[in-house]
Amino acid sequence: MFKAVWSIGRDRFDRIEALRRAAGACPQCISDGKDAYAGHVYVCEETGEPIAAGRMYPDGDALIIDRIAVMPQYDAMPYAEFVLRMLLFKAQELPQNDIRIICDESRFALVRRFGFAQSGAHTFTCSRNAIVWDSECRH
């Protein structure tokens, strides 16, 4: 079994930072100033072993979702999709209509399945009301 935990800002951020580092995030992607006001989702085993994490933060009239990280031993499982679904679900409660996802190429297909269109080298955009929720969970 696993559990998912929401946090805001740097509350319990040390484990998210450690997960990003262990998942192979580039040094400048471990932590930045946006983490202080972002919403974070953290997924772990019941034992506390980290599995995946992601964050979401406001940027003007849009919400940004980025830093989706999955531990290498869990990457073949659909935890990246689970994290993205949780972030998108929470986005439905927020006032921003546009959602932008910033990700690396390994997540492009996943993001497209939710109806996001590429709008930059590593950026995808979709309005909150146009999200495709019936994408299949695939490994």
Identify the meaning behind each predicted range.
Residues 58-66, 75-76, 119-125:
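A conserved beta-turn-beta hairpin within the catalytic core of GNAT-like acetyltransferases
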Residues 42, 49-57, 62-69:
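Conserved beta-strand in the GNAT
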